[in-house]
UniProtKB/Swiss-Prot annotation:
The lineage of its organism: Eukaryota, Metazoa, Ecdysozoa, Arthropoda, Chelicerata. This is Putative potassium channel toxin Ts25. One of its GO terms (cellular component) is extracellular region. Has the structural arrangement of an alpha-helix connected to a beta-sheet by disulfide bonds (CSalpha/beta). Residues 1-22 form the signal peptide. The record marks Y58 as: Aromatic residue of the functional dyad. It comes from Tityus serrulatus (Brazilian scorpion).
Length: 59
Protein backbone atom coordinates (compact mmCIF):
# COMPACT_ATOMS: atom_id res chain seq x y z
CA UNK A 1 0.00 0.00 0.00
CA UNK A 2 2.91 2.34 0.70
CA UNK A 3 4.18 1.82 -2.83
CA UNK A 4 0.78 2.85 -4.21
CA UNK A 5 0.84 6.12 -2.28
CA UNK A 6 4.42 6.76 -3.36
CA UNK A 7 3.54 6.24 -7.02
CA UNK A 8 0.44 8.42 -6.60
CA UNK A 9 2.50 11.29 -5.15
CA UNK A 10 5.04 11.01 -7.96
CA UNK A 11 2.24 11.06 -10.55
CA UNK A 12 0.69 14.17 -8.96
CA UNK A 13 4.03 16.00 -8.90
CA UNK A 14 4.77 15.17 -12.54
CA UNK A 15 1.26 16.32 -13.52
CA UNK A 16 1.74 19.63 -11.70
CA UNK A 17 5.04 20.25 -13.47
CA UNK A 18 3.50 19.46 -16.84
CA UNK A 19 0.47 21.71 -16.25
CA UNK A 20 2.65 24.61 -15.11
CA UNK A 21 4.09 24.86 -18.62
CA UNK A 22 0.84 26.30 -19.99
CA UNK A 23 1.11 29.78 -21.47
CA UNK A 24 -1.62 32.42 -21.62
CA UNK A 25 -1.16 34.85 -24.49
CA UNK A 26 -2.84 38.22 -24.87
CA UNK A 27 -5.11 37.12 -27.70
CA UNK A 28 -8.89 37.18 -27.49
CA UNK A 29 -10.97 34.32 -28.83
CA UNK A 30 -14.45 32.87 -28.90
CA UNK A 31 -13.59 29.36 -30.13
CA UNK A 32 -10.46 27.22 -29.86
CA UNK A 33 -9.83 27.22 -33.60
CA UNK A 34 -9.01 30.95 -33.39
CA UNK A 35 -6.17 30.21 -30.95
CA UNK A 36 -4.26 27.68 -33.04
CA UNK A 37 -2.60 30.12 -35.49
CA UNK A 38 -1.87 32.56 -32.65
CA UNK A 39 -0.22 29.84 -30.55
CA UNK A 40 1.82 28.62 -33.51
CA UNK A 41 3.06 32.18 -33.97
CA UNK A 42 3.73 32.71 -30.25
CA UNK A 43 5.31 29.43 -29.12
CA UNK A 44 5.49 27.23 -32.22
CA UNK A 45 2.89 24.68 -31.05
CA UNK A 46 -0.72 24.27 -32.19
CA UNK A 47 -1.98 22.77 -28.92
CA UNK A 48 -4.35 25.40 -27.55
CA UNK A 49 -7.67 26.17 -25.87
CA UNK A 50 -9.92 29.18 -25.63
CA UNK A 51 -10.63 29.74 -21.93
CA UNK A 52 -12.55 32.81 -20.69
CA UNK A 53 -11.98 34.54 -24.05
CA UNK A 54 -8.19 34.18 -23.72
CA UNK A 55 -5.97 31.79 -25.62
CA UNK A 56 -4.07 29.20 -23.59
CA UNK A 57 -1.17 27.49 -25.35
CA UNK A 58 0.34 24.13 -24.40
CA UNK A 59 3.98 23.45 -25.32
Amino acid sequence: MKAFYGILIIFILISMIHLSQQVFINATCTVTSQCRPKCIEAIGQAASKCINRKCKCYP
